[in-house]
Amino acid sequence: MGATGLRSYALKSYGVKMSPEEARLYRRRFFKTYPGLKSWHDNERRTWQRGGTETRTVTGRRRMDIQKLTDRLNAPVQGTAADGLKLARALLWERRGECPGAVPVLVCHDEVVVECSAEQAADAKARLEKAMIEGIDTVLNGADEGHVPVEVEARVAISWGEGG
């Protein structure tokens, strides 16, 4: 995201107004703090400028016919997160006997909804968190746990529509 996009995103999402120079400054500071990300962005930009139209997730899943730079930058990140979520869902299914009344009923973007009785809620929440962490950790770190820390948030609610 360039400085113009950052300004627009900050205003629309958070009501934060910033000048073009402030947006450029925040962007420079961000990349100075995360030089590896800056290097990756620069490399992806060069590849895109040379006509590179394919990206891959950490697991190797391909996205073809990339036309826009933002898609080239977003696809590997979002796709890798999706790969981790898919593995987490598989782990939930494999372990369904551990909490038989807890049933995954919905996946939307990065959210998983599990239905269960009130008595099982704490156990179902813990099992969901464990599966999510293990799935994403396996995708990001493989057999070597601990390189990229993984955190997830889960909550117990009466309905998915509850704020939180």
Residue ranges and their predicted role:
Residues 1-164:
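Conserved catalytic core of nucleotide polymerization and phosphodiester-bond processing enzymes
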